[in-house]
């Protein structure tokens, strides 16, 4: 009788050991499978229209998300589109709106009164900045948006630039305070936040000379980006620049940023970088096979730390 009890206990122990090893093996297997099968890959695409091709792109390429840049869009249609997307895909993805895309910036407000960042800057009120960002976030969240490319942290642009209305102020201290409150409001409301444009948006061209040695000297108002980092922004959007590794290292090492770097819209394959979430322009939307080839050709070089950060971010959705 004692032997039977002992044997039963041993078998029970072996059973629990087996279950533990099996579960952990599956976790490892699934993690490896995610990399091998590209279940979470650092590519996002700009969406200019909704159709079945979009669903195929999301499901067949396993991109991590979309930025909705559809023209003539209102909040009701946005709600319907996102519901259709969620019904037809079986995984979490980033669904974003871009602050300075003119056709979607103000779709969740009275079109007769556009609350641009420049207006908030004129009010010089941190409480007002937080209030407006909270209202935006709650409205966007209610229709299924989970990420916003905002705010713009730069304090300078060309007078003719479309960014002019989206910049809080040329006063670095004021801009930093408003940026902090805006990011905090988005985060408090549960939106993933991507601030931009690092290191600068210059003269309507996202270009910086590769021969400049002193990185600090050309960073446009670094303290405004530090305000975004202090408010725990998830992502920083980096301009298309040569020698971009210097700026990546400066963000992580000097500015102590621990989040994710994301590119601006990519129109040329040469601008794809392995340490960032690559945002492909809507041009890539036309050919799903070309898109798959681009991802397959670049995924092997993708930074594993980036993949890990991105996976954690998407799991929170």
Region locations from a protein language model:
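Phosphate/pyrophosphate-binding betaalpha-module
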Residues: 185-197, 218-235
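Preference for extracellular/luminal or secreted protein segments
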Residues: 1-62, 254, 270-277, 281-317
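Short, well-ordered coil/turn segments that N-cap beta-strands
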Residues: 39-41, 64, 90-94, 145-146, ...
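A general structural motif
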Residues: 46-51, 215-228, 244-245
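Alpha-helical packing segments of well-folded alpha/beta enzyme cores
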Residues: 132, 136, 178, 221-224, ...
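Core alpha/beta catalytic barrel or barrel-like domain that forms the active/cofactor pocket
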Residues: 149-152, 193-203, 231-240
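Enzymes and membrane/adaptor proteins characterized by extended Gly/Ser/Thr/Asp/Glu-rich
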Residues: 57-178, 202-213, 241-246, 263-298
């Amino acid at each position: 009788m004692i032997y039977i009890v002992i044997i039963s206990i041993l078998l029970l122990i072996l059973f629990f050991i087996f279950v533990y090893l099996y579960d952990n093996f599956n976790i490892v297997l699934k993690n490896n499978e995610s990399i091998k099968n590209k279940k979470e890959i650092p590519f996002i695409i700009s969406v200019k229209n909704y159709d079945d091709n979009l669903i195929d792109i999301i499901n067949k390429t396993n991109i991590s998300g979309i930025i909705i840049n559809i023209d003539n869009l209102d909040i009701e249609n946005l709600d319907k589109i996102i519901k259709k997307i969620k019904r037809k895909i079986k995984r979490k993805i980033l669904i974003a709106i871009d602050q300075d895309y003119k056709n979607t910036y103000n779709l969740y407000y009275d079109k007769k009164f556009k609350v641009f960042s420049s207006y908030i800057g004129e009010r010089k009120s941190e409480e007002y900045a937080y209030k407006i960002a909270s209202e935006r976030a709650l409205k966007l969240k209610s229709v299924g948006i989970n990420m916003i490319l905002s705010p713009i942290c730069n304090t300078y642009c060309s007078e003719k630039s479309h960014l002019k209305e989206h910049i809080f102020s040329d006063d670095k201290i004021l801009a930093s305070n408003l940026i902090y409150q805006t990011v905090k409001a988005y985060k408090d409301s549960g939106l993933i936040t991507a601030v931009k444009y690092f290191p600068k948006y210059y003269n309507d061209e996202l270009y910086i000379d590769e021969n400049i040695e002193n990185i600090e000297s050309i960073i446009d108002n670094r303290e405004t980006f530090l305000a975004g980092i202090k408010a725990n922004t998830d992502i920083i959007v980096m301009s298309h620049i040569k020698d971009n590794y210097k700026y990546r290292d400066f963000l992580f090492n000097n500015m102590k940023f621990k989040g994710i770097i994301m590119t601006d819209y990519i129109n040329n394959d040469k601008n794809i970088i392995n340490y960032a979430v690559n945002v492909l322009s809507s041009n890539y939307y036309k050919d799903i096979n070309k898109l798959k080839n681009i991802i397959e050709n670049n995924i092997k070089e993708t930074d594993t730390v980036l993949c890990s950060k991105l996976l954690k971010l998407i799991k929170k959705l």
